[in-house]
Amino acid sequence: MRIQVNAKGAARLLSRHLWVFRRDVVSGPETPGLYPVYWGRRFLALALYNPHTDLAVRAYRFAPAEDPVAALLENLAQALARREAVLRQDPEGGYRLVHAEGDLLPGLVVDYYAGHAVVQATAHAWEGLLPQVAEALRPHVQSVLAKNDARTRELEGLPLYVRPLLGEVPERVQVQEGRVRYLVDLRAGQKTGAYLDQRENRLYMERFRGERALDVFSYAGGFALHLALGFREVVAVDSSAEALRRAEENARLNGLGNVRVLEANAFDLLRRLEKEGERFDLVVLDPPAFAKGKKDVERAYRAYKEVNLRAIKLLKEGGILATASCSHHMTEPLFYAMVAEAAQDAHRLLRVVEKRGQPFDHPVLLNHPETHYLKFAVFQVL
């Protein structure tokens, strides 16, 4: 059995993009699985396939293989081998072991938290392979949890569930990140439990010192904890009371009495702080993905600009703005244009301190732009 694509679908795969949409599939099997993709008689790729979803074809290999399952699992073995050194050096840390398309393992994410793995599968073909995924992880971890509760699974016709695949899965684990420790709720936390893509950026922010810092969209205090090592007072803002409870717990875990939490809508709070004349030496903005799709980009641009504008107005002269976007639809040129426009409207000048992005364990494929989603930039406000 094979998948036949039209010229447009073939062009995408020949350019080494991994995705072909259903509208560009001419014919294919009726059941999801792993299949070869052809354009006429020409072999193009091996792919995860689901005829019932818009994103029908997800390529993982551009050469034929006798055993498609073995070829996919070889990609998994290679992804784990690329992380082996860091796991030996930092077994108590938090890292991404599998980054979906970035590791040629579309629809699969595996995160590592101090000896325990959390798996999320969002492509149908992975469902029957999860026991083999757990076995591949066995040499590296004490337990494996399948946290398959993402709503995107429903688009694939898959059930939502959370259950152990291997070993005894603890409710929570303690992760060491540089000089900071934090607790991860493996079953109930957002994503797989924490936001590991900002790990290196959180560590980078430890170099700054000052009186007052503001961490907006703080979640469980990720940036706030690192900032508290160098600032007299850090204010962590989030709209979730539960997230802030965890932030306070993490602050206590580290003996940090200088972290104060505020439950509030970020946009409303930033406007209020400006009216009250509050000023900060540093502001971190780590908002959610305002642009979930292409149709959201214009609205998202306005939202990102508004929150950056308000943050810039709160900064003292010489203060530091660290700002992020985790939407791949908000491209890098758009992101920097938005920040520049926000600075212009605030009548302030920004000096680039550093442009950053995803860490090594969230690899980017140049031919597949969707893998490059995280922008993180640090500016000095003049």
UniProtKB/Swiss-Prot annotation:
UniProt GO BP: methylation
A Pfam family: Methyltrans_SAM
Any GO CC annotation of this UniProt entry: cytoplasm
Residue ranges constituting the PUA domain according to the UniProt record: 3-60
Location of this chain's protein in the cell: Cytoplasm
GO terms assigned for molecular function: methyltransferase activity; RNA binding
Name under which the protein is recorded: Ribosomal RNA large subunit methyltransferase I
Source species of the chain: Thermus thermophilus (strain ATCC 27634 / DSM 579 / HB8)
